[in-house]
Amino acid sequence: MLVVISPAKTLDYDNPAPTKQYTLPELVSHSAELIEVCKGLTPADIASLMSVSDKIAGLNAARFASWTPSFSLENAKQALFAFRGDVYTGLDADTLSPEELEYAQSHLRMLSGLYGVLKPLDLMQAYRLEMGTALGNGRGKNLYEFWGNLITDKLNEALSAQGDDILVNLASNEYFKAVKIKGIKGTLVNPVFKDAKNGQYKIISFYAKKARGLMARFILTTRTKTIEDLKRFDYDGYYYSPEQSTPCTPVFLREER
């Protein structure tokens, strides 16, 4: 089972990762092409393109300017420990055991606007470049056109290497749009998380994001291998709903809290 999650806007480069082990991103030559485009943007361009404040635009202009294709523990951090946000709160990577982290290297991938696909221990220099950004580049008008089939090909490689053909999509729509679904050589599973509110079960973004992280953790810590096993997910009050589910879209409900 291979799990795919989104990155996060919030980054933590202040606290050290719990391991010194690292790997290098495999698509970094493509990242370098994007960085060259981004280095040509002024802070005002970035503010407009990304709809961010002048302060965040200035920070990201500085990040683009200082980015280098040489990665080390001095200028980068392992991706799984650098990202912070609702999904990563649920995943709680800092408390994974060394064995679980090793398992994650084969069974977890993070999608990224700048890096394409990241393994948990891949070093990552700080950046902000969301997949939905309409950044014109030498390959097209946005990042979906830039990455083309590269992300799908990398996921197929990882899917083949980890031993079965199940890809669990716990990423957002914005990021999973970068995957060519028809090109995936396996079974795609799209879990859905709904919370009760005013008598109805609804997808509530904040809760759903955290639930995606919780399910990623469940898969890594229990070494889930089948869709049947996935239905046992019960973290934080969620339970499987056979009535609302279809074979490849398992739905998990939670009562109002």
UniProtKB/Swiss-Prot annotation:
- Pfam families assigned: H2O2_YaaD (PF03883)
Which InterPro entries does this entry report, sorted A to Z? YaaA
Gene Ontology biological-process entries: response to hydroperoxide
> GO cellular-component terms in the record?
cytosol
The entry assigns this protein to a family as follows: Belongs to the UPF0246 family.
Enumerate the NCBIfam families for this protein.
PRK02101.1-1, PRK02101.1-3
Q: Which HAMAP family match?
A: UPF0246
Q: What is this protein called?
A: UPF0246 protein Sama_0917
